[in-house]
Amino acid sequence: MNNTRRKLGKLVTASAKKQPLNKAFLTDVMSAIEVLDRKGSRMPSKTYKPSSMVCMRQMYYQVTGEKPDESRTDYASIGMADTGTRRHVAIQEAIASMAELGYDWKYLDVEEYLREKWAQGKCLDVQVRGKRGVETSLYHKTLNISFMCDGIVRYIPSGENLLFEFKNQISFKYSHDDKDRGAVSKSHVDEAHEDQICTYCMALDLDRALVLYENRDNCNLECPEVFEVTPEMKQARVDKILECDSYVERQVPPPMHFDSKPCRWCQYKTACKKHGR
């Protein structure tokens, strides 16, 4: 595979030399973006990821260390992901300043929040692994869950703490409400995000969440609802992890997901095809 990449690199270089100088510059910039992205890639950790819990078979592959499919991400896709990451930072920095500006919202430091919970004998299974900007890397040692928490916000008048999650979407997804097909705008949290939100709330002892959606194309914002997370919803995610654990113990992949929605961006298509339904 390395030899193939070297050959491709030489072909790109040779092609660039035949182009006008401005086009050669453009080609090399795009190539450099892709090379740097590949250098930064690494094997996923053998943990459950709340953002990838729709398909249990994918959960199984992640936690057993199945090698993801080889893929080459083009510069445009890398740029779109980078834009989403930078918007994360900008939005979180604005929220972190709201209390100082006189608004009724306070952005909580997740580690300090957890220290208060630990003192109360709660969230004892959750460890802080570090920070990346304003996001906090967390690990649930009993359920083997790792995740990046966007934050927790406090509504100052009531003192209520709510999970905060930010999603950057293309126009189609941003304007689509999968719980109300006739809606002209998003009025519910996307079903695809419910596992993630419920798992975060379970781990952090929170009962409600605010999910802020941004339209990637024009930067419009929407917070469609206060998402209520019941004890039953939290337990359902725990049960899903425990069920997957049972497959891991037997070294038998779970059945395929009932529909192909999670398959589009799945990194384990080769292994999944090999194991069949």
Language model segments and positions:
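A short beta-strand motif that forms part of the nucleic acid-binding face
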Residues: 167-170, 215-216
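Short linear motifs at secondary-structure transitions and domain/linker junctions
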Residues: 34-36, 123-129, 184-189, 238-244
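Short, well-structured alpha-helical interface segments that form or flank functional binding sites
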Residues: 86, 146, 192-199
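Metal-dependent nuclease catalytic regions and adjoining charged, substrate-binding loops involved
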Residues: 9, 16, 176, 187-192, ...
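Short glycine-enriched, charge-decorated loop/helix-capping segments at active-site entrances
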Residues: 76-77, 179-187
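Metal-dependent nuclease catalytic cores that hydrolyze phosphodiester bonds in DNA/RNA
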Residues: 1-163, 170, 175-176
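Residue-level detection of beta-strand scaffold positions
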Residues: 163-164, 201
